[in-house]
């Protein structure tokens, strides 16, 4: 039986962020956590979003400057610009501009709604505060908007093509601010009337307003489908010769390369275990049968094989007919 998706609640927050609550049910036991965790990770890290990545302010050369007639210093203004919520309808970088001049007789509050943007870009939170200008003061700036995923620090990606007076910013492109999910076990009627235990997944999504929770969920689901679709047609080509060669090559590795302790090494040597191939003749249970070979030494060998070669010894002796 296919599960259903219900939208339980949606609302727009005071800061123009959006909230949505969804239910997915019925799911087989265990699938609630699988689906919820996968969606949560993709929602938080894989959805594209837009952000201000660089700002140039007239008369300012570095972020520790002050601007005459402006209450905030440059660092405060940059922090406010980072919190601008942008909806971009293009993947190309865009430029925005702001020119504000306070009247001679009163201060002026500068908000995001005063910025000038191209037709491909819009501000989602126009009431967002940027700065306060004293009477007669002027604030002029231009800024770069980019579209990307996740978080990008200036130290990791610095654009050397920008003019020197551009102040580059750490950018948060993630349009989804927060995701929460809960899984409840509920009983539903089965095919023969019996009450079967099912998972009921409740998913909560908070976005910055640049996209709706419904769109965010749709994009996340599409990403996961695209990620797993190729697995339906994976060609399973096996090469016995290659597999045998790899096994033989691994088997010839001397046990010295496992970096074992002196005690474990000497015990193996006395038991005529000289190579990995010799060691693979033993199960974890059989290692303990080697003279003077204790539990600690066995755990050391098992860990060394896994760490250096990715090999796991079988826990017990193989059954023989």
Swiss-Prot record:
Reaction equations catalysed: RNA(n) + a ribonucleoside 5'-triphosphate = RNA(n+1) + diphosphate
Gene for this chain: rpoA
Organism: Thermosynechococcus vestitus (strain NIES-2133 / IAM M-273 / BP-1)
GO cellular component terms attached to this protein's record: cytoplasm; DNA-directed RNA polymerase complex
Complex and partners: Homodimer. In cyanobacteria the RNAP catalytic core is composed of 2 alpha, 1 beta, 1 beta', 1 gamma and 1 omega subunit. When a sigma factor is associated with the core the holoenzyme is formed, which can initiate transcription.
Record's protein name: DNA-directed RNA polymerase subunit alpha
Biological process according to GO: DNA-templated transcription
Family under the similarity heading: Belongs to the RNA polymerase alpha chain family.
Matching InterPro entries: DNA-dir_RNA_pol_insert (IPR011262), DNA-dir_RNA_pol_RpoA/D/Rpb3 (IPR011263), DNA-dir_RpoA (IPR011773), RBP11-like (IPR036603), RNAP_asu_C (IPR011260), RNApol_insert_sf (IPR036643)
Keywords: DNA-directed RNA polymerase, Nucleotidyltransferase, Transcription, Transferase
Annotated segments matching region Alpha C-terminal domain (alpha-CTD): 252-321
Domain remark in the UniProt entry: The N-terminal domain is essential for RNAP assembly and basal transcription, whereas the C-terminal domain is involved in interaction with transcriptional regulators and with upstream promoter elements.
Function in brief: DNA-dependent RNA polymerase catalyzes the transcription of DNA into RNA using the four ribonucleoside triphosphates as substrates.
EC assignment: 2.7.7.6
Gene Ontology MF terms in the entry: DNA binding; DNA-directed RNA polymerase activity; protein dimerization activity
């Amino acid at each position: 039986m296919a599960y259903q998706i219900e939208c339980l609640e949606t609302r727009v927050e005071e800061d123009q962020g959006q909230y949505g609550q969804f239910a997915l049910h019925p799911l087989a036991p265990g699938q609630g956590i699988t689906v919820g965790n996968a969606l949560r990770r993709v929602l938080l890290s894989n959805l594209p979003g837009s952000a201000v990545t660089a700002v140039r302010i007239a008369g300012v050369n570095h972020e520790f400057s002050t601007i005459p007639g402006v209450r905030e210093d440059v660092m405060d203004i940059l922090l406010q610009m980072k919190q601008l919520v942008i909806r971009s309808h293009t993947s190309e970088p865009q430029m925005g501009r702001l020119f504000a001049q306070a009247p001679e007789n009163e201060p002026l509050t500068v908000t995001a709604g005063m910025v000038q943007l191209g037709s491909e870009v819009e501000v989602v939170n126009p009431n967002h505060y940027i700065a306060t200008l004293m009477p007669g003061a002027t604030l002029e700036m231009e800024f770069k908007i980019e579209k990307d995923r996740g978080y990008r620090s200036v130290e990791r990606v610095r654009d050397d093509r920008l003019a020197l007076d551009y102040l580059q910013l750490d950018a948060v492109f993630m349009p989804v601010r927060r995701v929460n999910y809960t899984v409840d076990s509920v009983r539903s009627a089965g095919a023969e009337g019996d009450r079967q235990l099912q998972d009921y997944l409740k998913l909560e999504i908070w976005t910055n307003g640049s996209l709706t929770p419904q769109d965010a969920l749709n994009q996340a689901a599409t990403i996961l489908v695209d990620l797993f679709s190729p697995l339906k047609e994976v060609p399973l080509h096996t090469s016995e010769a290659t597999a045998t060669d790899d096994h033989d090559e691994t088997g010839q590795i001397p046990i010295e390369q496992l970096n074992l302790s002196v005690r474990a090494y000497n015990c193996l040597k006395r038991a005529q275990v000289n190579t990995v191939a010799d060691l693979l003749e033993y199960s974890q249970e059989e290692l303990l049968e080697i003279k003077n070979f204790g539990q600690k030494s066995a755990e050391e060998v098992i860990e060394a094989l896994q760490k250096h070669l990715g090999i796991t010894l079988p826990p017990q002796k193989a059954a023989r007919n």
